[in-house]
A protein has these predicted regions:
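Conserved Radical SAM active-site core
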Residues: 72-212, 218
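Auxiliary Fe-S-binding modules of radical SAM enzymes
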Residues: 1-26, 92, 220-348
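Hydrophobic faces of well-ordered beta-strands that scaffold small-molecule active sites
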Residues: 45-51, 99, 129-131, 152-154, ...
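Short, charged low-complexity linear segments at domain edges
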Residues: 27-48
């Protein structure tokens, strides 16, 4: 069955299930070679780089695994718009052209208007502006698109409704359906891309990864003019000391990445600084075609407005942007900061 899945001309969810299974684990090197060839065919030697910018750590949700959960006794910070300008300028000086703006769940201070204002400021400086915030209405997503937002990233965390309820004890994030349906609202509202993912470690990874595939496939069918990207975040240590009930090893994570590259050959796969330098070096160009670099997970972090707040999670790869780019070039890969000019945002 594994050989048939690897040789399939049009792999789908059945082949993905086989490639995610324990039976495929001994064929990891074969999967890696296939994933590398597919990545080279569809994405060349390019690895797109981005940087996250945390705008606010204020949150009223009770996610048991998150360093920003409302029951954490840590100082809360939120950047003023002037501080946002300073942080964006600091990122721009580092050479970044794609920024991901992050907040906690919706609250009175850091709500839609605040996110929109931050997007406008970022769009005046960067060619690509993504947001990883709270679920919004289709109309609100349309407002972000008009302000210059390119797309969203919104992890379902886990697709198992019962586990989701146990992991989100109170607050707006407890609404499973509102979060699940948000990427479709974003694409319907005019955003170009939707980034999906499940937080590996919360639930059975086999179930979550098959559900992630189904979610991505649905969006690709329904919103053919838009794009989908997939991330594979693993739980990292945070202030509350949460221990994942379903720990995922590096070897299993590699198997997941290779399986998705084989079964979704033209979908961008993303890997953040949650992972170690050694692992990220090995995955670059082998399934993964988009990576963060020089990341900070505290509010601010790049300029003079850097806060002393707790980070959302520990960064595992602390290399700066030049060092990370040097690694990519040493592997024969091309770090790319800019995919398109901001002037063409409304042209498609």
């Amino acid at each position: 069955m594994v050989a048939a899945a690897l040789s399939s001309k049009s792999p789908g969810i059945r082949e993905l299930a086989v490639l995610l299974s324990p039976a495929a684990a001994p064929e990891l090197e074969t999967m890696a070679q296939r994933a590398r060839a597919i990545t080279r065919r569809h994405f060349g030697r390019v690895v797109t780089l981005y940087a996250p910018l945390y705008l606010s750590s204020r949150c009223f949700s009770g996610c048991v695994y998150c360093g920003f959960a409302s029951n954490r006794s840590t100082p809360r910070h939120m950047l003023t718009l002037e501080q946002v300008d300073a942080e964006l300028d600091a990122l721009k000086r580092r050479g970044m052209e794609e920024v991901l703006l992050l907040t906690g769940e919706r609250n009175a201070a850091a709500g839609y208007e605040y996110v929109r204002d931050c997007v406008e400021r970022a769009a005046s400086r960067f060619s690509t502006v993504l947001v990883e915030v709270f679920p919004m209405s289709e109309q609100e997503y349309g407002g972000l698109a008009a302000a210059g937002c390119t797309g969203i990233t919104l992890y379902q965390e886990t697709y198992d409704p019962q586990t989701y309820e146990r992991m989100h004890l109170w607050g707006p994030k407890r609404n499973y359906a509102a979060r699940l349906e948000a990427p479709a609202r974003a694409l319907a509202g005019g955003l170009r891309t939707a980034g999906l993912g499940a937080l590996l470690g919360l639930s059975d990874p086999f179930f979550d990864m098959l559900s992630l595939y189904r979610h991505a496939s649905y969006l690709l069918r329904q919103f053919w003019r838009g794009g989908v990207a997939l991330s594979f975040p693993r739980i990292r240590p945070e202030a509350g000391g949460f221990q994942p009930p379903f720990p995922v090893t590096e070897r299993l994570l590699a198997q997941i990445i290779f399986a998705f590259r084989i079964c979704l050959p033209d979908v961008p796969l993303v890997l953040s600084t949650r992972e170690s330098p050694r692992f990220r070096d090995g995955m670059a160009g082998v399934g993964i075609c988009k990576m963060s670099a020089g990341s900070r997970t505290t509010v601010g972090g790049y300029g003079d407005s850097a806060s002393s707040s707790e980070c959302q999670f520990d960064v595992n790869d602390g290399r700066d942007v030049p060092a990370f780019c040097a690694m990519l070039r040493g592997k024969g890969l091309q770090p790319v900061f800019k995919n398109w000019d901001a002037a063409y945002r409304d042209a498609i």
